Amino acid sequence: MNLILYQRDDCHLCDLALDVLANARVPEFQSVFIDDDDKLETRFGERVPVLHDDETGRELDWPFDPVAVRNFLADTAIR
């Protein structure tokens, strides 16, 4: 599983998402900032933060909580 958290600089929701991922005990993920990437900005825009599984293409849009994250990870692992 290759998880990516798409986020922005100075984004309070993104900071909250980082706390949620820590509370859900997500072991490893990349943080990708979309601010300076036109392609990512077009794709994610106002949706950030978005948790993305790069292997399956599945995405979990904000708002999410630790339970939703754990369910997302479990569902992704089954696929």
How would you label these PLM feature ranges?
Residues 1-23:
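Local sequence-structure signature of Cys/Sec-based thiol-disulfide redox active-site neighborhoods
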Residues 6, 32, 61:
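Small/polar loops that bind or transfer phosphate-bearing groups
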Residues 9, 35-36, 64:
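Short beta->alpha linker loops
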Residues 15-16, 43, 64:
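Generic recognition of short, well-ordered alpha-helical segments
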Residues 27-38, 45:
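Thiol-based oxidoreductase modules, predominantly thioredoxin-like and allied folds used
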Residues 45-52:
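Structural micro-motif
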Residues 55-79:
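Non-catalytic, surface beta->alpha helical segment in thiol-disulfide oxidoreductase systems
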